[in-house]
């Protein structure tokens, strides 16, 4: 139950630390996170804060959205997300507040969630790292097939969960315990060590890591 930020993946680059070692980092644009609603147990049955991010053209905002954003006194965003919070942390926020990248600090560990790149319909070798069969020595047109997918008349079926070919990627993915390398409060940029899921310009959610001591 921690507050996070929604940002946009700008791309990857590198920075040099004090020892001159090259550190690969992902640049995340974390600007324009606004609180649109604070939900309490009395009115909603649970405690959470609703946040909008990014910008949306006025002609793309319907009346329901326009009224919701106007009530909060914030600019219309391109999406909404909720973060479950305790009542104590919820008391510190109100509709219209802006959450900035300053909530993170250098050296902190964060979890980054995004939508992985879609690879389309892929076979078992690419999707599940299966080994290929022989390229010759009697093998005819079965070089990349998965092989046996079951047993005999008993059980007479393919068990659920069997790894097979299918849609690969384009799923929600989280990378845990990435180190914050730099926080640019002026430009609202966050630099984290390593790669994060998703393509350039895709949305990502950054939260304080839940496994810091693990």
Curated annotation (Swiss-Prot):
Domain of life, per lineage: Bacteria
Gene3D superfamilies: 3.30.160.810, Translation factors
Alphabetized HAMAP family for the sequence: Ribosomal_uL3_B
Modified sites of kind N5-methylglutamine: 153
GO cellular component, one term: cytosolic large ribosomal subunit
Region (Disordered): 131-155
GO MF entry, a single one: structural constituent of ribosome
Alphabetized InterPro entries for the sequence: Ribosomal_uL3, Ribosomal_uL3_bac/org-type, Ribosomal_uL3_CS, Transl_B-barrel_sf
Post-translational modification: Methylated by PrmB.
Protein name: Large ribosomal subunit protein uL3
BP-aspect Gene Ontology terms: translation
Assembly behavior: Part of the 50S ribosomal subunit. Forms a cluster with proteins L14 and L19.
UniProtKB keywords: Methylation, Ribonucleoprotein, Ribosomal protein, RNA-binding, rRNA-binding
Keyword rRNA-binding included in the entry's annotation: yes
């Amino acid at each position: 139950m921690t507050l996070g930020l929604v940002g946009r993946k700008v791309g990857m680059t590198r920075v040099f630390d004090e020892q001159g070692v090259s550190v690969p980092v992902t640049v995340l644009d974390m600007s324009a996170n606004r609180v649109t609603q604070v939900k309490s147990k009395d009115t909603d049955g649970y405690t959470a804060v609703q946040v909008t991010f990014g910008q949306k053209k006025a002609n793309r905002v319907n009346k329901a959205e326009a009224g919701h954003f106007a009530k909060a006194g914030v600019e219309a965003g391109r999406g909404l997300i909720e973060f479950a919070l305790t009542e104590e942390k919820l008391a510190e926020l109100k509709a219209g507040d802006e959450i900035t990248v300053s909530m993170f600090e250098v050296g902190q560990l964060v979890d980054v969630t995004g939508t992985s790149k879609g690879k389309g319909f892929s076979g078992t070798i690419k999707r599940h790292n299966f080994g290929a069969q022989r390229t010759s020595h009697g093998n005819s047109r079965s070089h990349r097939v998965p092989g046996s997918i079951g047993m005999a008349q008993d059980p007479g079926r393919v068990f659920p969960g069997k790894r097979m070919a299918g849609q690969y990627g384009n799923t929600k993915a989280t990378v845990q315990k990435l180190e914050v390398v730099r926080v640019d409060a002026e430009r609202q940029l966050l630099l984290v060590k390593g790669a994060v899921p998703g393509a350039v310009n895709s949305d990502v959610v950054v939260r304080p890591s839940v496994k810091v001591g693990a």
